[in-house]
């Protein structure tokens, strides 16, 4: 989930900061990840998913895993490697659903989110291309652009982590103790470092 969606979420940020050292970008994005999940862990008594897994059908962590639950992340890695867009939420969370209504709920939320994002993106794109492209295509970037870009990209990343941490946390106990939290946070943080390197 992290490998697939992080590139979609912060890909333009990474592309426009290719001149920066990889470790600086990793520490920035990884630091935001750590702050975001630590906040959830403190606020929600060990839950790193911002309580997104408290709905019926996902409220208990699995005591054993089925083939589909283990294979889902492997399929996701293969699809990501093939550069195919995929809904990580639907692919991962639906394999843990305990009832058909849970799958329907996940599918409904995913589809409504996609339609909303498509509509909003289309409106913004039309406004930007018609209004701003002619005005700003020939101008030089302001010195304020980079800090504003880092702020907005960091905010987008934090919100993505708040929404999609459930895709990873679905494999974990719903309330992590300190050792489990450090292991989870460290594993993802190091994984982000490998991804950025």
How does the language model describe each region?
Residues 1-197:
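Multi-pass alpha-helical transmembrane bundle typical of ion/small-solute transporters
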């Amino acid at each position: 989930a992290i490998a697939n969606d992080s590139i979609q979420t912060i890909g333009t940020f990474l592309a426009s900061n290719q001149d920066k050292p990889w470790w600086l970008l990793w520490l920035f994005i990884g630091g935001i990840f750590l702050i975001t999940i630590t906040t959830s862990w403190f606020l929600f008594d060990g839950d790193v998913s911002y309580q997104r897994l408290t709905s019926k059908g996902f409220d208990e962590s699995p005591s054993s895993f089925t083939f589909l639950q283990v294979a889902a992340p492997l399929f996701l890695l293969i699809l990501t490697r093939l550069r195919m867009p995929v809904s990580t939420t639907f692919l991962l969370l639906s394999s843990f659903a305990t009832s058909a209504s849970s799958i329907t709920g996940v599918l409904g939320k995913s589809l409504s989110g996609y339609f909303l994002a498509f509509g909003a993106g289309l409106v913004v794109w039309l406004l930007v291309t018609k209004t701003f492209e002619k005005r700003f295509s020939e101008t030089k970037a302001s010195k304020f652009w980079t800090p504003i870009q880092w702020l907005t990209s960091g905010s987008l990343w934090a919100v993505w982590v708040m929404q999609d941490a459930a895709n990873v946390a679905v494999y974990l106990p719903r309330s992590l103790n300190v050792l489990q939290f450090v292991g989870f946070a460290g594993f993802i943080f190091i994984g982000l470092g490998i991804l950025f390197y």
